[in-house]
Amino acid sequence: MFEVTVVSSEFDAKIQQKIDTKTKPLGALGALETLAMTIARVLGPDKPQITKPTLLVFAGDHGIAASGVSIAPSEVTTQMVMNFLKGGAAINLFCAQGGITMEVIDCGIAQEIHDQPKLINHRLGAGTGAIHREPAMTLGAVKQGFAMARERVALHHGRGCNLIAFGEMGIGNTSSAAAIMAALMGREAAECVGRGTGIDAATLARKQLLVEQALFLHREQLGDPYGVLACLGGFEIVQMTGAILAAAELKMLVLIDGFIATAAALAAVTIAPHARDYMIFAHESGERGHKLMLEHLNAQPLLSLGLRLGEGTGAALAVPLVQAAATFYNEMASLEEMGISI
């Protein structure tokens, strides 16, 4: 469905030489140098510019939420979507501060919102099935979600965006992400399930049990990533996965947020391994399992702030770092130009 090509290594030596000969000791800009390499490899070695950074927030509800895996009821998904639309959430403020275009997409919240022209309708249903009792969705819904996401990413690419990030909102979605992680990485539920919105020990134990039940129930369908997404995914996680693949196909930089987004990235890389080449990982969240996924994907996150809010907040905070890496790569003087000997 997606044709994601490997990022060429043809200019790696040229890019590295340009980084190494800036007016600084070798490696003195640390992770920004690695980031500059990624930017130049994806966008080209000659003055790559970050243009029209964009963040899409995908929202969807989860049937498993009715079983008490979160401190919040599923109604909060709709309430928070309205908060996004009114500009009152953390992600709104961070995007405004960073000059990031933000868009909110209803992938399948339980309570449909009407008369909100800024809300993009990508509804695949009114919440997923409860994954510990039934599949989250059909394979057809996965494919439809991919197609919708691809179209949206292509729209922003056509408008000049070459750095895209994704956030999410969905009560219960850390349960879905943990199940996806366990299925795709062959891990035990206990290694993947965390406290999400801040649940207590009893709720954590119940959440882990339900994820274990989901993995056992669908064990015959978890042999490929499409089956994993259909059985265990969320409508917002599916569309995020499709959006990551679409952006990689279009050779855009893809900024990955926290635990949920990394589960979508894991699914995307399982489908198209070269998608990994286009990814920048914004931060390591406070959610159990995120570090394991980052290690599995050989990812070095830019930030470690203990964030566990979701929404794409970590990605939005990382955009200025991406811009800074491009700026030093393009504009910092060379040792030769300045006559400096190090």
Curated annotation (Swiss-Prot):
Active site as annotated: 311 (proton acceptor)
Disulphide-bonded residues: none
Reactions that this protein is recorded to catalyse: 5,6-dimethylbenzimidazole + nicotinate beta-D-ribonucleotide = alpha-ribazole 5'-phosphate + nicotinate + H(+)
UniProt-listed Gene3D superfamilies: 1.10.1610.10, 3.40.50.10210
GO MF terms held by the record: nicotinate-nucleotide-dimethylbenzimidazole phosphoribosyltransferase activity
EC number: 2.4.2.21
Top-level lineage group: Bacteria
GO annotation (BP), single: cobalamin biosynthetic process
Pathway this chain belongs to: Nucleoside biosynthesis; alpha-ribazole biosynthesis; alpha-ribazole from 5,6-dimethylbenzimidazole: step 1/2
EC class (word): transferase
Record keywords: Cobalamin biosynthesis, Glycosyltransferase, Transferase
UniProt-listed InterPro entries: Nict_dMeBzImd_PRibTrfase (IPR003200), Nict_dMeBzImd_PRibTrfase_bact (IPR017846), Nict_dMeBzImd_PRibTrfase_N (IPR023195), Nict_dMeBzImd_PRibTrfase_sf (IPR036087)
Similarity section: Belongs to the CobT family.
PANTHER family xref list: NICOTINATE-NUCLEOTIDE--DIMETHYLBENZIMIDAZOLE PHOSPHORIBOSYLTRANSFERASE
Job description of the protein: Catalyzes the synthesis of alpha-ribazole-5'-phosphate from nicotinate mononucleotide (NAMN) and 5,6-dimethylbenzimidazole (DMB).
Designated name of the protein: Nicotinate-nucleotide--dimethylbenzimidazole phosphoribosyltransferase
Gene from which this protein is expressed: cobT
